[in-house]
Amino acid sequence: MRNYTDGKSAEQLIGHIGFCGPVEVDTSSVKKVLITGAGSYIGETFRAYAGKHYPALHIDAVDMLDRSWKKADFSSYDIVYHVAGIAHADVGNVDDATKEKYYKVNTDLAVEVCKKAKAEGVKEFIFMSSMIVYGDSAPYGKKKVVDEHTVPQPANFYGDSKLQADVAVRDLADDKFKVVVLRPPMIYGKGSKGNYPSLAKLAKKLPIFPKIENERSMLHIDNLCEFLCQIMLVEFCTPSVVLIPQNAEWTKTSEMVREIGEVCGKRVRIVGILNPAVWLGSKVPGKIGGLVNKAFGNSAYAQSMSVYEGIDYQKVDLKESIRRTEG
């Protein structure tokens, strides 16, 4: 456990959601960016995307797998973008040593990198937090829409390890050292890990799938990369901001499965007859119920949280995102 959240008010835990007003993307402003987390899926995809679409961003990356990064000179960079972390946690029956590993990587490392960036004169630090700081998905049949008044309340050590860093790096912000915290929902794209590949496997195998009217926020990797490029080229007035990028539309699990099947040339029938089985599965304690609620539960951000005047990043809709992911 770490104690950066101790004594914080609800407002401090939530943070300053969004910019303080309209912003303007200045594509002529050259920025030097250092990614801390070389070889990561998000870091490498972003680096390639920015290289293709935003030549004003000059990007390097440093490996965080050993301590050699501590000798790196951060002083020539305008922005440090910290992506190193452990995700996709199986939080059941985990020993204390494993939990400590999550805190060392997700909390301690992030804070250490942020302090180094500030000490060496970097102007801006961008931290990848996660929607997981708001807890688990609501179970099947229950709604969950996070808005700007929702207080982060992690359900497990993984979420807490992210929130501790989320709060700690914002505490380091001042007028000369801006901190941007991103709390994205599930990120997916070609080569991604996590829940999406598991869902895609089912879509390619199953002839039928339950018709569940759930609501989930998701973020395609190209939309994230576009968002990152644009926010790196804007100025904002508050020392720290919390940003919530997501796709323009919420996703239903059944709709996503149908689209994956269609892109892969396979017809998946979406039928309501299986819904009672899903309901029963959601009531089973332990891993089965957890998996059912993870797939068919509700976890969405209010769309208004993800609209920023001057930023136009939601370029890829659901159908196109699946085509790019499966193509």
What kind of feature is each model-predicted range?
Residues 111-157, 180:
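Conserved Rossmann-fold NAD(P)-dependent oxidoreductase catalytic core, especially the SDR/UDP-sugar
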Residues 96-100, 104, 140-187, 208:
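Catalytic helix-loop patch of NAD(P)-dependent Rossmann-fold dehydrogenases
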Residues 227-230, 234-290, 315-326:
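Mid/C-terminal beta-alpha module of Rossmann-like enzyme folds, strongest
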Residues 67-119, 134-136:
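NAD(P)H-binding glycine-rich loop region in Rossmannoid oxidoreductase-like domains
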Residues 1-24, 29:
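Small/polar-residue-rich segments within soluble enzyme cores
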Residues 201-219, 223, 227-230, 239, ...:
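A conserved pocket-lining segment of Rossmann-fold NAD(P)-dependent short-chain dehydrogenase/reductase
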Residues 163, 176-177, 188-198, 231-243, ...:
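Glycine/proline-rich active-site loop of Rossmann-fold NAD(P)-dependent oxidoreductases
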Residues 30-52:
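N-terminal Rossmann NAD(P)H-binding glycine-rich loop of SDR-like oxidoreductase domains
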